[in-house]
Amino acid sequence: KITPWKVSGKVNYDKLIKEFGIQPLKELPKIFDENLLFRRKIVFAHRDIQRILSALKEKKPFVMMTGLMPSGKFHLGHMLLAQQMIFYQKLGAKLYIAVADLEAYNTRKKSLDELRKVAIDEYLVNYLALGLSPKNIEFYFQSNRSNDARKSNAYYRLASNFSSYETFNEFKSIYGDINIGKINA
């Protein structure tokens, strides 16, 4: 069984691709061979990579968004994601990294102050040490998106806007076992 939070048992990648609603990676431009994760097929599937490929081909800007749950020590899995984001940044992506402190608060039962400290000391510092450029990036906390009123509720506005495009079953296929705290975050 695989969810974003846990892996147990033997991994059936074909089943995983089907369950998570993703597509296997096919031919990619040569520049992707420069990245170990793509070259070694550690990144083996995608959702909408054709949008990135089109933007690169047409020399148009594109963005990548990822998130992290500040639940503990930075580990190999976090490093692999950081390396992937660094690669996209080098290709010209503007990055958005959301710290899922509200989700961690609901699932890990730590204070928001503790979670903020872990996010900065364990994740952000390591991202920068691995080569993430502080330029062309927005690193923010769910609990405190911005002092700018236009951005402060952007997370919830986006979630509300996108929610009409996703069904509960699609959400569950992406995130696995869920509770109200995970849905809300």
Question: What is each stretch, according to the model?
Answer:
Residues L112-A185:
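Divalent-metal (Mg2+/Mn2+/Ca2+)-assisted nucleotide/phosphate chemistry catalytic cores
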Residues M64, L95-A100:
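Short beta-strand segments at enzyme active-site cores
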Residues H46-L56, I86, V125, K182-N184:
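Short, charged beta->alpha transition segments
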Residues A98-R108:
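Short connector loops at secondary-structure junctions
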Residues L68-P70, D101-E103, S143-R145:
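Active-site-proximal loop/turn and secondary-structure-junction residues that shape catalytic pockets
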Residues M69-M79:
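Short, glycine-rich nucleotide/cofactor-binding loops
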Residues K1-L68, I137:
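Non-catalytic terminal extensions that flank enzyme cores
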Residues G77-I97:
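Histidine-anchored nucleotide/phosphate-binding helix
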